[in-house]
Amino acid sequence: KVEPAIRYAEVLLIYAEALNELTSGQVYHLTTYTGADVEIQRSVDEMRYAIKRIRMRAGVPDYSEETYNNPNDFRVKLKRERQIELLGENSMRYFDLRRWKDAMTEENQLLQGCNINISDDETRIADFYKQTIITSVHKVFEQKMYLWPFPTYELKRNVNMTQNPEW
């Protein structure tokens, strides 16, 4: 099966996130790969343009004006939007949590799911959908896991290279 390298929804989410992280009121001057000069700044209209395309397609309402105007509120909403929109796609959540430095909190939470060991008794079907703590899966995330270790053979090939902390 051929899978796209990147979906348009992801491009829009990346764009909105990048705009949100810019300092409000400050104009940045950049040079494109063609040599053209462009100005970029945190723009609520541009952020709304990107997010609205995704939310309209899903049939859910746009965010409030207050959300767009508050970078912290928008960041929280955007993280949730990425979690939902990119569910199950190329380990996106894995890398997002590390990029945002949220993995320590998110990945050390107890795993919850449905009770798959419930009996076939029809009177207990509703119990299947009750959230259950999965005790058989032990999740551990440590600070050192934000960076991967370099393979030993790479360290031997380059004596100037040092291993990442705690590895």
Predicted regions and their residues:
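Acidic/polar-rich alpha-helix caps and helix-coil junctions
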Residues: K1-W167
